Amino acid sequence: MFASLWSVESISGKLNPNKNPQISWFYVFFPAVIGYFVILTGYINSKPSTGTIEILHPSFSTLIYPNSKMEIIASGSVWSEGPLWVEDESTSLGYLLYSDTQLNKIFRWDEGKGFFTVGKTLHSEKSGCKIDKGYCETMHEPGPNGLLKMNVALMPITSQKSVDLLVCQHGERAISLIKENGSRILIATHYQGNRFNSPNDLIWSPEGNLYFTDPSYGLMGKDGINVKKEIQFNGVYMIRKDDISESILTGLPTKNVILLDSEMSMPNGLAFSPDFSKLYVSNSDTENGYWKVFNVSPNTGALSNGRIFYDANNLLLLEKEKHGYKENYGNPDGFRVDIYGNIFASGPGGVLVFSPEGDIIGKFHLDKPVSNVAFGGDGRLYFTVSDMIVRVFIKAKPVRIISSHFLKR
């Protein structure tokens, strides 16, 4: 085969394409094919950009790249929420999980490692409400919300590579463990004998305790008839790691749920400061939106000295006036904190970036309301934006809890 393509000089022994017209054709055609393939893959993998980025303080320039653009990587959701980046040790790549509170599903988005983007796939169905429960189909948002990877220190029989999730379930009005094999365990369902409203977001503390919020969004029915509210406030709670472990072992939801705060009207997103001495919580109320900060006891994990970190009511009013009071263009919602204490928060008009002192240093302006944000292991920040997923390259790095912390304390 090769002899028919290549002519060999009898004296030098060198390959000479000029002696064979087939080789001349090969030298022209092959680079053209490669070039076409590169252009084709670039076109197929290209993603539309959206929104604008505004620098309000020089410090924000150190967190983003020049000429950064936000790009839409997935669409087709109804209300996307709960973004969670998962490192896949088997492929040395990561992927994004996110929930849809109205479709009652968890989706997965992969970049992939081949020539073409893998994109969006279904990760878990009926992940917020079981279909055999009659009220699921009557609820406005029966699905899952916040997602959190289960720590293996609390599940000694689980492999480090296993992706077991703690899920805030609106329809079940519970926090549940959904294992990678599809089995489920209810971790917590009640506070003092009363059913939760609709758990919204959740995070780990370094000690392995679980903090979560429980507003009442998930109680809304499609026909205007809401599910009965059993707890007369919307709270911020904690479950200690030993009680989580016991719940997993027994298969029964824990009764040891600790109320940390009951004063916020709609507690939603929450995150710790880099040294874990403070807890930030957003209040996602269109009539009284703000971010609050609490001191965290290093001994008990209890909260104290709650005060307003940033009052969002003026921003909410501006957005209402801008859009003619017709739609909601973002309340204080989910957020993340970087290693320097900057807060990347979904809020009025897009994603606001706060300094640790509470000043807005930058904005990611978007034309649709943003529900939450997540740091990716690929150097990007991911946004759940109404019916789509958006990402942008950033320099900021997330605060991380090392797994060994759970074992030491």
Task: For every predicted segment, state its role.
Residues 19-29:
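N-terminal Sec-pathway targeting helices
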Residues 42-409:
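Sequence-structural signature of mature extracellular/luminal beta-sheet repeat domains
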Residues 2-3, 7, 27, 31, ...:
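Residue-level detector of intrinsically disordered, flexible termini
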